[in-house]
Amino acid sequence: MVLDKLKEKVSTEPNVAVYVDGPNVIRKQFDLDLDALREDIEEFGNIKVGKVFLNQYASEKLIEAIVSQGFEAALGLGGEKDKESDVDVYMAVNAMDAVYNDEIDVIVLVTRDADFLPVIQKAKENGKETVVIGMEPGFSTALQNAADN
């Protein structure tokens, strides 16, 4: 009986892919708690993909903290410290994998950046539920309005 309930829950929960724009939201000014973030996202379903994208300047301590919270640390290269890097491109390409993955139902982007608007639009065109989590200042209004949640 318990096993049947567990099987039912596993089979009916949506599968979620989470992509975190590290350089954009993991900053001292925002004090992002990855554990709390994961718990909030689990309300949308089972997290099957959880990646935090970082640039090559990310400290070992930060990478360790990300991994200990159950996320994969994905390093993108390029750009100068404190300037634009290829992290956005790397994250967008990975998110597009989820858009075309039939096993993913919900795509969550944690960013403030309007550069990810095409990902949200393409995800919705392909029947995915979309969630954007961000913070002020600088949280793109267009991104917020385009997402389902």
Question: Which role does the model predict for each range below?
Answer:
Residues 1-90, 100, 129, 137-138:
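Domain-level signal for Mg2+-assisted phosphodiester chemistry and nucleotide/NA-binding surfaces
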Residues 89-92, 117:
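Glycine-rich phosphate-binding loop at the start of an alpha helix
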Residues 101, 105-141, 145:
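Active-site histidine-anchored catalytic micro-motif
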Residues 148-149:
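Receiver (REC) domain switch/active-site residues of two-component response regulators
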